[in-house]
Amino acid sequence: LTSYAGAQEVVGAESQLGKMLKLAYQNGAGTVLAYPVAEDSAAAYSPAVSAILAEKQASLCVLGSALEAVQTAFCTALSAAAQQKGECIGFCGMGAATAAQLGARAQKLNCERVVFVGPQVYAAGETAAQDGCMAAAALAGALAAERDPALPLNGLELQGLTGVTAVYSDTEYDALVAAGVTALE
């Protein structure tokens, strides 16, 4: 898919994948490989992740699931792809979670190929908090648009997001970063 308009036709604007694609495009993603899944399970996501990683041009991959089993399988697939020269960085997040829960999940995954994003976010035009996969999609889109990988992410404004569900103390931010969470403000 090369545009949000094209993505809307394929997956629908109101689907989770449609909303993720919108955020990725708003933040600068160019061409996006998307694979809809019928249910939130490791069995459903496995062929989707495999198909995307089989495309060697995939450099960033966003997971739409917040389930630990799905995220663990995602990490395994990304690590296996890297061994086959399929260099791809994954992005994922969680649903409603405390700072401690985010940190614990990131430590449990402990995957150098995955950017674990939190907390939940508010998307423009939405009243309910959106799962971490939406924040992950926005961040992946912004990183896809960057030409210089050495640029810091501090102060990066993600388009299409209006806020986060949690504001952490400095101590909590330090703990999140130490655990491997990319904490949004």
Spans of features found by a protein language model:
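An N-terminal, globular interaction/scaffold subdomain
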Residues: L1-G64
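A glycine- and small-residue-enriched flexible loop/hinge signal that marks low-structured segments
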Residues: A44-E185
